[in-house]
Amino acid sequence: AEIKKHHNNHYLSRTLLLIDSPELFLHPQAVELVRVALKNLSNEGYQIVFATHSAQMVTSEDVSTSLLIRKNKQRGTFMRKRMEDAVRQVVKDAPSQLQMLFSLSNSNELLFADYVLLTEGKTEWRVLPALFERITGQSFALIKCALVRQGGVSNTRKSMQVLAAMDIPVRAIVDLDYAFTTATRDGFLEANDPDIKFCSNLFRELAFQKHLRLVNGRPVNKHSNIPAAKVYAMMASMPEAQEPIRNIHEKLCKQGIWVWTRGAIEEHLGLDGKNEMVWRNFNERCKSKNFIQTLPDYDGIETLCQWIINGSHSTT
C-alpha cells in the first residue's frame, strides 16, 4: 500500500535501503516472501542493497549481477568480479555469453562457495554429495564447495576460465570421451598426444571386431550398433589401455580435471542406469554398513574424494 501511495514521489525514487541479512530468524517461506518483497520494491523506485549468507535470497536471475564480498588474512575484505563481467571477459560473442550465463547461473550456491566443482552430467550431481559424505565424513558444504552441473562438457574450459576470472578456485569432473573429443581443442592435451593416439588404435581394433562406426577415429552413437559411451567403457577395460588412460588421467588432473578412467561414473559405481530411481537407490545404499564392499572401484572413488578435498585446501 505504501509503495502504491508513493510510487510517483521523486524523493522516494532515490531512497536507498541497506539491509544486513534480511533472512535472519525466518523460516524458508518467510525468506521467500522477504526476497519477493525486496524485488518488488526495487522495481518501484527503491534502490535495494542487502548482504546475505543465504542462497535462497538470490535466484538464478540475479546470480550474474550479484557482488561477491570475501575476507581473508592475505587480502582483508575484497570484492570478486561479478559473473556477468567475467563472462564478458572470457566469452566474446553475445549468444555464447547468454548460454554461459544461463549454464552457470543455474547454481546460486557458487556465490557462497570458496571452491567450485563442475560436473558433466546429472549422475554426478545426484550421487556425489551422498557418496562424498559417506567416504570422507564431510559434506560439500563443510569444505565450502559448490557442486555445479554443466549439462555437458563443451563449455568446460570457458566455465573454468570464467570462475578463475571471478577468483573462484575450480575443478571439473568429466567422462573419458572428453579427453578424446574436446580436451585437445580446449588446450588441455597436445594434438599429437601419444596416449590418445594409442587408445585411438584400440578403437579401430574394436570397430573391426564389433562392427562399430567411428567418425574421425572416435565412437559415435549415430548408425552404430553400440552406444559411444559403451565403446569407451569397452576400450577402457582392455588391459593394454590401462597405462595410456592412466597417463591421460594424470595429465588432466594436473590441470584441475578429473576424467573417469573407466569411461563414466556409472562404471566406477556399478550403476545400471541414469534415472531418478537408480540415483535414489544408490543414495540409500550409501547408508548401508557393507556399502564400501559393493563399489566396483572403491580405491578410485577414495582417490577422487581426496582430490576434491585437496582442491578445497588450495583456496586457503
Description of each model-found segment:
Residues 1-106, 310:
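Switch/communication elements of ASCE P-loop NTPase nucleotide-binding domains
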Residues 100, 104-118, 122-316:
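Acidic, Mg2+-coordinating catalytic modules of nucleic-acid enzymes
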